[in-house]
Amino acid sequence: MRILAMTRAHNAGRTLAATLDSLAVFSDDIYVIDDRSTDDTAEILANHPAVTNVVRARPDLPPTPWLIPESAGLELLYRMADFCRPDWVMMVDADWLVETDIDLRAVLARTPDDIVALMCPMVSRWDDPEYPDLIPVMGTAEALRGPLWRWYPGLRAGGKLMHNPHWPANITDHGRIGQLPGVRLVHSGWSTLAERILRVEHYLRLDPDYRFNFGVAYDRSLLFGYALDEVDLLKADYRRRIRGDFDPLEPGGRLPIDREPRAIGRGYGPHAGGFHPGVDFATDPGTPVYAVASGAVSAIDEVDGLVSLTIARCELDVVYVFRPGDEGRLVLGDRIAAGAQLGTIGAQGESADGYLHFEVRTQDGHVNPVRYLANMGLRPWPPPGRLRAVSGSYPPATPCTITAEDR
């Protein structure tokens, strides 16, 4: 079996040597594109014994962020792979480390033939002296990525300006995607809140409507669910939670579904298709849905097999939308205790997942449901190391079409 590792570097001297060392542990070849680096990237590539092929752009070309668009760069790497014809390809960014707890070669050798690509967790380093515990107090720094796939002739890149997955756009023509335990990608960038804010501002200049980010707002994605103009609120919430100053939680109050196995498939806030007024949790069919807080059932709606339950308490409405199982249904006026089971989540069409759309409203409009939960001391994001794929794919996708007026 032959494994080809690939990356694209531009002034990556700070991280490149460590990235190459981590790839050399299991790969037979490492191919690299050096995109007009002016630091010591070229020297590192020339001296690293595991690097077997380098394509360099002329250094005197204009100093744009990348010489060619991301999709064209991926195509060049794919065509380089055609000259190697490996069994497996791993592609990473030049500031990613690959950490393994397994014999990766042995695992790939026994991977079923119908699995043609593999996802694994990516963890961002965090080293912010001003906000040292922002992760995990405000959210997670883990996400699934797809760095590994089988080589086939004719693989092609996605056509977006940026944020194309590393794996080929047509890889699923050859089989299905699996998940690879025991391997982690460690991202060296975005290790402080200030770096994340700068990255959000950079992406918004390039893609103000986040069309290339799968329709997901950059600030909500990188700033733990907060908008760019809510950074002061993020900092204030962090300081509150560090002090243990949480909003009151009723006896029995809990997350709407258990932490494991659970994933956030779609977050709250602006998306390319409109304003999403809640958060969508993906979980296994049959998972119970619980009332976060007590109240009375004030509305029940059913559309296309989905049930929408609204539980009202004082000036707060909490909405739960899911495809129910076969249990008995609630009726208008039912009094619900905090922590009571509202139902179970049914399967969603052809997907192996079930989904819960969770929404919180006040008289002033919708509020961020993740912030609502976390400010009571409930952490709705998955615990470290327990990521779950959504719909078995990357990027995560949910069938939710609920939108509302921007608050």
UniProtKB/Swiss-Prot annotation:
User: Which CDD domains does the annotation name?
Assistant: M23_peptidase
Record has Signal as a keyword: yes
> Which Gene3D superfamilies does the entry mention?
Glucose Permease (Domain IIA), Spore Coat Polysaccharide Biosynthesis Protein SpsA, Chain A
User: Which GO CC terms are listed, alphabetically?
Assistant: peptidoglycan-based cell wall; plasma membrane
Keyword line: Signal
Looking up Pfam families in the UniProt record yields: Glyco_tranf_2_4, Peptidase_M23
Kindly indicate whether the keyword Coiled coil belongs to this entry: no
Signal peptide as annotated in the record: 1-27
What species was this sequence derived from? Mycobacterium tuberculosis (strain ATCC 25618 / H37Rv)
Instruction: Quote the protein name from its UniProt record.
Output: Uncharacterized protein Rv3786c
Q: Which terms does the record give in the GO molecular function aspect?
A: metalloendopeptidase activity
